[in-house]
């Protein structure tokens, strides 16, 4: 029975609830989340860990005037329930349904949209400074996890916060996890605070003595210096306070009464304050508590067993993971780098077999790329496995530190193209465009997961940067693997008719299906696998143009700056410079200049006319 949950009317009720009722409400919210996400899938473990914290925040703050920014945003399901969206969970992350992240168009209480990590403090600080310049009165809060705190942007923001003394509250949600287990110096530092409460007890007792003792100024100054020295011994660095940020904690992130008291204290302090809360990712569901990594983002699952309802087959991530282990056996110079995504990118097996050659840098893509550059300069063969959407964060480093020096770094780009339910902030539809204009960069796309190992071996033997991009999941049809590669040379799969469909990566399977459907309609098509996006195969394009082919390019990337534009530009140059007298026409198919929302992969390709039927319709238009 969910008496409080079922009768909940809005945020104003939280401020009137007793702590015992809030504790009951927390359990009812957990039951609701476990039940709903078991059917739809979603980010379960992170949301189960912030139930009490969210309730405490919304009991203290008035969201009609105060502002709260949630870092990453995948832990905002409780926020969505409390702000009136519980009835939309049946369509969570589905096309046309509720987003799994904050969306300003969904609610006035979604103050800032997030998806990538480490942005909340910067955004909240911007809001706080806007408040001050406009002479407004409100509280601004950033909620950030210990994983996100490993991101350089978060540290940059803290540095700015402490320097300018802006009134801002930062809640550190410390669950010792990002998606997987946290790594690095920041994580180690926080661990020392968690397990050693001596400083916090000392600070409270010391301040109490000073308040009760009548002493002179000189003695007080000496004692303050003594206090400073002792706290350095007890908690080395006192990282936050030395940056000029008042530190409160660590406190139990599942004790609503204690949370409320500390938040109220922070609310009444001048200058920036950081509240350090300790939470358990997956709390309240035994399977998520035992394996929070698996329940970070999970598909529909069985409530009683915790097992995923639909077991996926072979994936590109697994193919990459197997391939890099095999490659590392042959070449001791191979090293693997990830930015807090070991399991997601398929590197678990490598990390266990070659722990000294595996480097998880935390949520620090910029650092990861330049680390790889340094390794390459020193004779190693670094392979950086990263999701397409997160490689965006290291754009400058790829250009400045890798391509500019023409260093042999391999980028294994996972989750390229449409990833589905995570939505706009996670779709991998920009990488071809931002990599395509980088000098010295070679870009490859396997048409089948069996090609990953051959591409990876080829890439690792080059003396310049190579990016291999591949989609989430596996293959829709079985295609024979191309096993040998010559830079810039494509693969002709079908030679029929005077229409050439040139596809890259995952879209080759779509092209094959289109060819079969068009043939049944009496139209013959030549299908070409553009296994190299950069450089393009100029000899094939020149041949097609000289024979007046209608050329159609097909990619799972935005059209602007993408693969198709490279083909179009070269084909046009052949015609406009009078190199070839041709009536060829080039049509580019890909994603338009817009952000792609959440939904299933199949539905999103269909909605953008990049499924088989959509491509066929586009071909018919130019016949």
Swiss-Prot record:
Subunit structure comment from the entry: Homodimer.
Keyword Phosphoprotein: no
Species: Clostridium novyi (strain NT)
GO terms (BP aspect): 1-deoxy-D-xylulose 5-phosphate biosynthetic process; isopentenyl diphosphate biosynthetic process, methylerythritol 4-phosphate pathway; terpenoid biosynthetic process; thiamine biosynthetic process
Enzyme Commission no: 2.2.1.7
Protein name from the UniProt record: 1-deoxy-D-xylulose-5-phosphate synthase
Gene designation: dxs
Keywords from the UniProt entry: Isoprene biosynthesis, Magnesium, Metal-binding, Thiamine biosynthesis, Thiamine pyrophosphate, Transferase
Its biological purpose: Catalyzes the acyloin condensation reaction between C atoms 2 and 3 of pyruvate and glyceraldehyde 3-phosphate to yield 1-deoxy-D-xylulose-5-phosphate (DXP).
């Amino acid at each position: 029975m969910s008496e409080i949950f079922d009768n909940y009317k809005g945020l104003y009720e939280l401020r009137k609830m007793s702590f015992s009722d809030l504790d009951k409400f927390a359990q009812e919210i957990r039951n609701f989340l476990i039940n709903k996400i078991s059917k739809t899938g979603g980010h379960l473990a992170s949301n189960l860990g912030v139930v009490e914290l969210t309730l405490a925040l919304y009991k203290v703050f008035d969201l009609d005037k105060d502002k709260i920014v949630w870092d990453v945003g995948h832990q905002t399901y409780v926020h969505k329930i409390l702000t009136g969206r519980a009835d939309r969970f049946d369509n969570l992350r589905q096309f046309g349904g509720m987003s799994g992240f904050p969306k300003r168009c969904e609610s006035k209480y979604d103050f800032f949209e997030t998806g990538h990590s480490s942005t909340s403090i910067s955004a909240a600080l911007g809001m706080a400074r806007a408040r001050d310049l406009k002479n407004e009165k409100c509280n601004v809060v950033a909620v950030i996890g210990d994983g996100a705190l490993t991101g350089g942007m978060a540290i940059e923001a803290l540095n700015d916060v402490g320097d300018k003394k802006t009134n801002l509250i930062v809640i550190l949600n410390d669950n010792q996890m990002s998606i997987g287990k946290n790594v690095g110096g920041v994580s180690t530092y926080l661990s020392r605070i968690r397990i050693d409460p001596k400083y916090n007890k000392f600070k409270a007792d010391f301040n109490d003595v000073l308040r009760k003792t009548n002493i002179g100024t000189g003695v007080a100054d000496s004692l303050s210096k003594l206090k400073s020295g002792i706290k350095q011994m007890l908690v080395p660095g006192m990282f936050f306070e030395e940056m000029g940020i008042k530190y409160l904690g660590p406190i139990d992130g599942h004790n609503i009464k204690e949370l409320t008291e500390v938040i109220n204290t922070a609310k009444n302090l001048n200058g920036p304050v950081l509240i350090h809360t300790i939470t358990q990712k997956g709390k309240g569901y035994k399977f998520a508590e035992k394996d929070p990594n698996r329940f970070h983002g999970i598909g529909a699952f069985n409530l009683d067993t915790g097992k995923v309802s639909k077991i996926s087959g072979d994936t590109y991530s697994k193919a990459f993971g197997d391939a890099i282990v095999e490659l590392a056996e042959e070449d001791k110079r191979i090293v693997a780098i990830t930015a807090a995504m070991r399991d997601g990118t398929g590197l678990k097996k490598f990390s266990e077999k070659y722990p000294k050659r595996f480097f998880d840098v935390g949520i620090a893509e910029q650092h990861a790329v330049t680390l790889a550059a340094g390794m390459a300069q020193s004779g190693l063969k670094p392979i950086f496995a990263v999701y397409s959407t997160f490689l965006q964060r290291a754009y400058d480093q790829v250009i400045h530190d890798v391509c500019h020096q023409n260093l042999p770094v391999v980028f294994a780009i996972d989750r390229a193209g449409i990833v589905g339910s995570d939505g706009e902030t996670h779709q991998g539809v920009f990488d071809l465009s931002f990599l395509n204009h980088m000098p010295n960069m070679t870009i490859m796309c396997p048409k089948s997961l069996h090609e990953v190992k051959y591409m990876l071996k080829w890439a690792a033997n080059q003396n310049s940067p190579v990016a291999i991009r591949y989609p989430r999941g596996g293959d829709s049809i079985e295609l024979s693997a191309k096993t040998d590669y010559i830079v810039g040379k494509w693969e002709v799969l079908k030679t029929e008719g005077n229409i050439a469909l040139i596809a890259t990566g995952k879209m080759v399977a779509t092209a094959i299906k289109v060819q079969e459907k068009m043939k049944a309609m009496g139209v013959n098509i030549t299908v070409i696998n553009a296994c190299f996006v950069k450089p393009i195969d100029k000899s094939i394009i020149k041949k097609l143009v000289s024979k007046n082919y209608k050329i159609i390019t097909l990619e799972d990337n935005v059209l602007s700056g993408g693969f198709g534009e490279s083909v179009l530009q070269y084909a046009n140059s052949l015609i406009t410079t009078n190199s070839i007298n041709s009536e060829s026409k080039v049509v580019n198919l890909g994603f338009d200049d817009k952000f792609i929302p959440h939904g299933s992969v199949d539905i999103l390709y269909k909605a953008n006319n990049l499924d088989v039927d959509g491509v066929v319709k586009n071909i018919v238009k130019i016949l």
